Amino acid sequence: MLVSRSAHLAALFLTLSGAAHAQTTAFVGGRVIDGTGRVIERGTVIVSGRTITAVGPASTPIPQGATQVHIDGKTILPGLVNAHGHVAATSGLESDPARFYTRPNLVRQLQTYAKYGITTVFSLGDDDIPGFQLRDENASATDRARLFVAGPVINGQTAAEGRTMAATVAAMKPDLLKIRVDDNLKTAVKMGEPAWRAAIEEAHARKLPIAVHIFYLADAKATLAAGADLIAHSVRDTAVDAAFIAGLTSRQVCYSPTLTRELSTFVYETTPPWVEDPFFLKGAEPGVPALLKDASRQQAFRASDAWKLGQQYKAGLEVAKKNLKTLKDQGVRIAFGTDSGPPGRFQGFFEHLELEMMVQAGLTPMQALVAATGDAARCHGRSGQFGTLEKGAAADLLILRTNPLEDIRNTRAIDAVWIAGRKAY
């Protein structure tokens, strides 16, 4: 579990609730999925200001004067929490920090997340001043996803490099740090062990949790043993073993599978199956669908080195799915994540695709939903602040027209999104 020194920023928006707007709203008659695994048929959720004040059965008393929202036949659950996403220097299928890592573009991305029901995003890397500023404004956000940031990803080879970079990023006051221990399938230089060990030590000395990007089981085990607080990607080279499982469960370290990240490395070799899906199109930037259908672009990709790597990641995806099922069965807490934000990893849409892929990997719809709500918040040390429908939590609500427990794709049947007690979409 990650616990950050800046958790008070996350709590601030809760304490401001009464002053902001004290309207009381009761959602009645719907199926309540509370983010912990509990279901209440025909339940009641009461919101006052920015926070939830009561959750219970139909008999739950409704305060006098409350506005009643009848959601019979619908499902209400917490806004989804992405434990590993990004706000990025991306526009369409282009990436350019100088042009695109701007406040207006980041706000647009956070609004896109929110339109798809993702109301909190932990951006794990490449975060700069505009991202930090938006994080600091979470208390007033009602039309975009809440944002937490890790700052620049820490790299290096020597202990001095790892320690210095960790200290430099920590001085920016991020919510956590992130290291990258990967060689991109032997095409890049991996972060040196002295550097990542020093970075972990420095993070903990500054009371900051640290997430680790890995690919190989050996690196996952080594960084976990050294104190990593979140395994931010799937192990993709081989089956996980008992020692790794024990390391995760003994320290209650969470594991973020990011299955759609692997999918994005090869799926554009042909036209992706969702390119004309209205649910995808509602968040797609102009021109993107046409580019994804462009045969010449696909042909150029298939002739590239990136495509060759994608074929290896395609095989890694199958390993990742099996490992996800194994880890969940063995009691490891799963932190829903997508690594969305870079080109081709579509914010909002990919989160729903990730849920579908998690269920295809063997999780139940409820297990996937808990990973994407209560457990995602818990894995970042923020239980009770958001991600669950409980007294005192942020009134971030996702209302669906149908039942996602019957078919996980029903998360796409979005009726409304509420953020901090206000209807946003």
Language model feature labels by segment:
Residues K74-N138, A218-L230:
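Metal-associated gating/positioning segment near the N- to mid-region
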Residues V87-R103, N155-A160, D183-M191, S304-Q312:
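Acidic/histidine-rich helix-loop elements
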Residues M1-A10:
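Bacterial N-terminal signal peptides that target proteins for export
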Residues T164-T187, D237-A361:
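Active-site neighborhoods of metal-dependent hydrolases
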Residues V32, T36-L77, D96:
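Histidine-rich, glycine-flanked metal-binding segment
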Residues V32-T44, P57-A58, E318, F346, ...:
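Acidic, glycine-enriched loop/beta-strand segments at the rims
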